Amino acid sequence: HLTLQKGKTWCELSAKNNYFFFLLEGALIVDFNECVGYEVGKGEMIYLPRSADFKIFAKESADLIILSYGIPVQLCDKLSLSQLGAFITDFKYEFKSLDIRVPLDTFLKLLVKYLDSGMSCQHMHELKQKELFLILRAYYTKEEKVNFFYHSIAASLTFKDKVMGVYLEARTVQELADKCGYGLKTFQRLFYSCFSE
């Protein structure tokens, strides 16, 4: 839970995580990759994938919740991001926010209460991540989710294509990582993220 004062710029994200920004009050101007000057208002959310090139500017004082994750907690096949990959073909991506709708607004109000009272442990964060993905699955359309998570879905598909194209030529994990153009640790992290679903 964070307050960003009017006129302040924020860009302190880790390249290892994906981020949800939920704007409870105020207005932000977001520069994200090719999209410059996108305005996010009260009651909207945006998603920034790991290693995103971005800048966030507070047009008005902003009250926001920032949730981050490295690899999404696995729920079930119907909730995995990779399942949305089937809908990405011939899809026209446009960076845009999503409205925070019922029951996501209630989820966020309760989350603020938890955080403001100092309740912040790994178990609570994992539970809330699961709950968030359940809400997104049930209350947002496939088209909205594909557009919202487009960069993560596309990156996952690209990695998967690389692996599937060369895996028969590799005898070890290190060889497979080399053939795909990654260091071993990065390859293992991406592999787990892509294929653990």
Annotate each PLM feature.
Residues 101-113, 126-129, 145-171, 175-180:
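A short, Lys/Arg-enriched amphipathic alpha-helix from helix-turn-helix/homeodomain DNA-binding modules
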Residues 80-135, 161:
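Amphipathic alpha-helical segments enriched in hydrophobic/aromatic residues interleaved with Lys/Arg
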Residues 11, 90-99, 147, 175:
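A ubiquitous short alpha-helical element
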Residues 28, 136-141:
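Short alpha-helix boundary/capping elements
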Residues 1-89:
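N-terminal regulatory/effector-sensing and dimerization cores
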Residues 138, 170, 174-197:
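Basic/polar phosphate-binding segments, predominantly the helix-turn-helix DNA-binding elements
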Residues 140-147, 195:
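Short, Lys/Arg-enriched N-terminal segment that forms or immediately precedes the first helix
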